[in-house]
Amino acid sequence: MAVPKKRTSMSKKRIRKNLWKKKTYFSIVQSYSLAKSRSFSGVSEHPKPKGFSRQQTNK
């Protein structure tokens, strides 16, 4: 015969929920800092040559 599970206490629920929130927060912070570092790293390493963006030929 099936026996119902015991109910999880509110404190355990709160602890687990806070752990889940903390993990997601740190993963968001880490991914944001990685995106920032990647978006600015390419600018300083390989600057774009100036004067080549608008080449026009006179006919």
Swiss-Prot record:
<dbReference type="GO" id="GO:0009536">
    <property type="term" value="C:plastid"/>
</dbReference>
<dbReference type="InterPro" id="IPR011332">
    <property type="entry name" value="Ribosomal_zn-bd"/>
</dbReference>
<dbReference type="GO" id="GO:0006412">
    <property type="term" value="P:translation"/>
</dbReference>
<dbReference type="InterPro" id="IPR002677">
    <property type="entry name" value="Ribosomal_bL32"/>
</dbReference>
<dbReference type="InterPro" id="IPR044958">
    <property type="entry name" value="Ribosomal_bL32_plant/cyanobact"/>
</dbReference>
<keyword id="KW-0689">Ribosomal protein</keyword>
<dbReference type="Pfam" id="PF01783">
    <property type="entry name" value="Ribosomal_L32p"/>
</dbReference>
<dbReference type="GO" id="GO:0009507">
    <property type="term" value="C:chloroplast"/>
</dbReference>
<keyword id="KW-0150">Chloroplast</keyword>
<keyword id="KW-0934">Plastid</keyword>
<feature type="region of interest" description="Disordered">
    <location>
        <begin position="36"/>
        <end position="59"/>
    </location>
</feature>
<dbReference type="GO" id="GO:0015934">
    <property type="term" value="C:large ribosomal subunit"/>
</dbReference>
<dbReference type="GO" id="GO:0003735">
    <property type="term" value="F:structural constituent of ribosome"/>
</dbReference>
<comment type="similarity">
    <text>Belongs to the bacterial ribosomal protein bL32 family.</text>
</comment>
<keyword id="KW-0687">Ribonucleoprotein</keyword>
<protein>
    <recommendedName>
        <fullName>Large ribosomal subunit protein bL32c</fullName>
    </recommendedName>
</protein>
